[in-house]
Amino acid sequence: MFRQAKWDEPLIFELSRSGRVGYTLPKPIEDVEIRVPEKLKRKSPLNLPELSEPEVVKHYTRLSGMNYGVDSGIYPLGSCTMKYNPKINEEIAGHPGVAYVHPYQDERTIQGALKIMWELEGWLKEITGMDRFTLQPAAGANGEFTGVMIIRAYHLDRGETQRTEMLVPDSAHGTNPASAAMAGFKVIEIPSNENGTVDLEALENAVSERTAGLMLTNPNTLGIFEDEILEIAKIVHKAGGLLYYDGANLNAVLGKIRPGDMGFDIVHLNLHKTFSTPHGGGGPGSGPVGVKDFLKDYLPVPLVGYDEESGRYYLDYNVPKSIGKVKELYGNFAVMVRALTYLKIMGRDGLKEASEIAVLNANYLTQKLKGTRGYELPHKELRKHEVVFSAEPMKKETGVKALDVAKRLLDFGLHAPTIYFPLIVHEALMIEPTETVSREELDAYVEALKRISEEAYSNPELVKSAPHNTAVKRVDDVLAAKRPIITWRMYRELKEKGEVDI
């Protein structure tokens, strides 16, 4: 049985002792005059912890023992594609030519960086069937917002101010309706049919002269491919709307089918999902947005261009109808470097094989777990890259909820799946193993879920009170959301008031 390391580890500020140093700056050869205006000079010393290098290393090593990441084991968060991040990505991203380049340099001195961005765009265009990309968005939701702002700008430019409605399936990512609402659209929910795909009749009834577009993930969040996608595209386009592709699940179809060939006009991708760059706490992310040719004039500025005559790359601000910037400078460049490294190492055939293995792994797990008491498999049996089980029968029969199952999995040294999403599946357990998980790891995961099923029916309190073997037990999720303590200053002030007991 797994048992996680547990250290009574203070915050690094609490370990600080005056006078301790980890690095000593060399003395200047001569006196250096620092020409900083008085009004910009600090009035008090900067409050940083003072520790030696060994103390810093020991502190973070101990913390790492109380953590879990993609290098620890299976991390099957559904619709997150938590695949292994190859270490060569980090090696290339840490190259001085990447790490030390500055965004304000003259573009004549950053030709290598611009070439990387140009080549990455070329790969993404080929993979998706789009005609132009911006690499500026910093993450998936930022990319979504960029995409819906382009839809908005397109319709306004055509004088179609009545197009105020964005259609979103009930199985969509939660950020889809949020992004649409932020862009000023009214969100219209489209229900799923008994197969877990978009209800075409409901879609036909929803489209009108007010329709701006439809935001769709394919495969969807149930892991089911929208096999009526060409008809969906026809319905939306006939109504004058645009079709938007949420690229969260692109890992399932790499090299098999392209969003552009399905009829999508706009696509956002997640380099931190599909293309193996770190995300979550290991970020930052990157959410490039691609468009068909008729929408390229609305992309954020600058774009990267290439002059064949001179052989030089350049930053192109000549985008007549641009929606403007969605992030400072040019995007998260080091993430782009990691993604391009992955693409070049994998190649076209490697990407295709990665998708095949991701789909195989999800279906292998599905077939091994289906029929287990307490877990129900809604909709179709065959999935793409992920599967959603329902723990609703277990909850009704034992009182053990999806949350309890997720917490108990931690006691086996395994990361929990996404839970309670998509909302159309009650007590959802959304599992995406990815292609970088072995058969043995899949077997261990299924066995743990089966063991938890046995415990739920024989000793439900054991599951309800889990986890038991982790460094941190159950936390108060509501309090954490209502009163986050995310800085040393906040923590210190609350502790001085006696409002925290840690």
UniProtKB/Swiss-Prot annotation:
<dbReference type="InterPro" id="IPR015421">
    <property type="entry name" value="PyrdxlP-dep_Trfase_major"/>
</dbReference>
<dbReference type="GO" id="GO:0005960">
    <property type="term" value="C:glycine cleavage complex"/>
</dbReference>
<dbReference type="InterPro" id="IPR049316">
    <property type="entry name" value="GDC-P_C"/>
</dbReference>
<dbReference type="InterPro" id="IPR015422">
    <property type="entry name" value="PyrdxlP-dep_Trfase_small"/>
</dbReference>
<keyword id="KW-0560">Oxidoreductase</keyword>
<dbReference type="GO" id="GO:0016594">
    <property type="term" value="F:glycine binding"/>
</dbReference>
<dbReference type="GO" id="GO:0030170">
    <property type="term" value="F:pyridoxal phosphate binding"/>
</dbReference>
<comment type="subunit">
    <text>The glycine cleavage system is composed of four proteins: P, T, L and H. In this organism, the P 'protein' is a heterodimer of two subunits.</text>
</comment>
<dbReference type="Pfam" id="PF21478">
    <property type="entry name" value="GcvP2_C"/>
</dbReference>
<dbReference type="InterPro" id="IPR020581">
    <property type="entry name" value="GDC_P"/>
</dbReference>
<comment type="similarity">
    <text>Belongs to the GcvP family. C-terminal subunit subfamily.</text>
</comment>
<dbReference type="Pfam" id="PF02347">
    <property type="entry name" value="GDC-P"/>
</dbReference>
<dbReference type="InterPro" id="IPR015424">
    <property type="entry name" value="PyrdxlP-dep_Trfase"/>
</dbReference>
<dbReference type="InterPro" id="IPR049315">
    <property type="entry name" value="GDC-P_N"/>
</dbReference>
<dbReference type="InterPro" id="IPR023012">
    <property type="entry name" value="GcvPB"/>
</dbReference>
<comment type="function">
    <text>The glycine cleavage system catalyzes the degradation of glycine. The P protein binds the alpha-amino group of glycine through its pyridoxal phosphate cofactor; CO(2) is released and the remaining methylamine moiety is then transferred to the lipoamide cofactor of the H protein.</text>
</comment>
<dbReference type="GO" id="GO:0005829">
    <property type="term" value="C:cytosol"/>
</dbReference>
<protein>
    <recommendedName>
        <fullName>Probable glycine dehydrogenase (decarboxylating) subunit 2</fullName>
        <ecNumber>1.4.4.2</ecNumber>
    </recommendedName>
</protein>
<keyword id="KW-0663">Pyridoxal phosphate</keyword>
<dbReference type="GO" id="GO:0004375">
    <property type="term" value="F:glycine dehydrogenase (decarboxylating) activity"/>
</dbReference>
<feature type="modified residue" description="N6-(pyridoxal phosphate)lysine">
    <location>
        <position position="273"/>
    </location>
</feature>
<dbReference type="GO" id="GO:0019464">
    <property type="term" value="P:glycine decarboxylation via glycine cleavage system"/>
</dbReference>
